[in-house]
Amino acid sequence: MEKRTTNTPKSSQEPRERRTGAAGNRMKAITIILDEHRSLAAILHGMLYLVRSIRDGRATPDFTLFGAMVYYIDAFPERFHHPKEETYLFRLLRLRHPAAGPVLDQLHAEHQAGETKIRELELALKRYEHGGATCFDAFASAVESYAAFHWSHMRTEEDDILPLAREHLTDGDWDEIDDAFAGNSDPMLGAKAGDEYEALFRRIANLAPPPIGVGPER
């Protein structure tokens, strides 16, 4: 999947928090969170690339591919990644550092808004598939809106929340967070991938044309 750097959170550019020893073990959840952010960023970049290619007349719509991408966004970040952030990282940071409350409240509201936005994206895709070219602009707008929303959200987590977590959470807190996030099954993190999600990622990569995948050019 294509990974660009413009207006995206740091996780979608270069890995970080690659530490060794006790500190590395304690902070491995941050690496997982950043890896999962990169996974979502790659899917969003892919969708934006396809939308722009269609708009420029360089590609025709592949609704199977779009459907797989939207399903990934719904199935992994919205159902697994965000709930674990809320249940473990945000809860413990709020306990250890109450001053983070306003930013955590903002992120919680964005998690809830994300569920609405993914439904809007699904609906826009269905309308485009059944309504044809007249519905393309609305679908493209939904993709661009969702991507901008999520990049802003991830940037807040990485620039504001993760530094506070590193500063204020205890070793015991990190053990709890690490155990929770280590159980995630992200299709773009091969070693921990569950069969369903790994198969989904392979399907997306095989369907997507170059340079975002290995599928046929359109």
Language-model-detected regions and their locations in the chain:
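Small-residue-biased structural context
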Residues: 2-4, 10, 14-218
